[in-house]
């Protein structure tokens, strides 16, 4: 039987205030865990959409699913924000967590944020990206940066995309794809 992650919520400082982050931490405390997973919602999104994945996928890796600046329970940025600002806020989060490398699960425009994050930290910060409903061109842009890419073709209303039932048939493939990399 697969272990279940400890689910937590926390706040981390970033250049725009505090980010509210939904977390899954492996039962073993994170020692010898697989590469951490950063879940990036689409524009104006929250980490809540990834709740169904936190427990099962977080059994052997830390997972961080933030509410983007100005969204959910994160502080408002105090200025207009877009993809680059979201990427900078996530970079601040990863620096606070001392994460050098992460895998990414990005939904919608979150794919563009993942690509912006990879451009900000080209030293292999992002190893693999799983995309759900990516904007046109995102997959090719990721490949041009040398990022291994896989698409998780979930359909339906946003609130149904990452329910346990909707992920069911593709869950094993997702675990296998993400689970193949231990931290360097």
Regions found by a protein language model. Name each.
Residues 53-57, 80-83, 122, 146:
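Glycine-rich, phosphate-binding/catalytic loops in enzymes
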Residues 100-139:
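Conserved hydrolase catalytic core segment
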Residues 20, 82-84, 112, 126:
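A structural signal for the main folded, soluble domain(s) of proteins
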Residues 23-73:
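Conserved HGGG/HGGXW glycine-rich cap/lid loop of the alpha/beta-hydrolase fold
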Residues 45, 56, 96, 116, ...:
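Active-site catalytic microenvironments for nucleophilic, acid-base chemistry
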């Amino acid at each position: 039987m697969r272990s279940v992650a400890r689910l937590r919520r926390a706040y981390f400082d970033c250049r725009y205030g505090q980010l509210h982050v939904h977390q899954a931490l492996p039962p073993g405390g994170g020692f010898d865990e697989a590469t951490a997973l950063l879940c990036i919602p689409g524009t104006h999104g929250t980490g809540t959409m990834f709740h169904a994945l936190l427990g099962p996928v977080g059994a052997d890796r830390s997972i961080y699913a933030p509410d983007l600046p100005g969204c959910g329970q994160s502080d408002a940025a105090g200025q207009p924000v877009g993809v680059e600002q979201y990427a900078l806020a996530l970079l601040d989060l990863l620096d606070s967590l001392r994460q050098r490398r992460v895998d990414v699960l990005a939904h919608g425009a979150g794919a563009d944020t993942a690509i912006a994050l990879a451009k900000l930290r080209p030293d292999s910060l992002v190893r693999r990206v799983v995309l759900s409903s990516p904007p046109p061109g995102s997959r090719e842009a990721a490949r041009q940066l040398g990022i291994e890419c896989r698409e998780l073709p979930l359909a339906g209303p946003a609130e149904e995309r990452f329910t346990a039932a909707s992920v069911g048939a593709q869950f094993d493939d997702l675990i296998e794809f993400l689970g193949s990399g231990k931290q360097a």
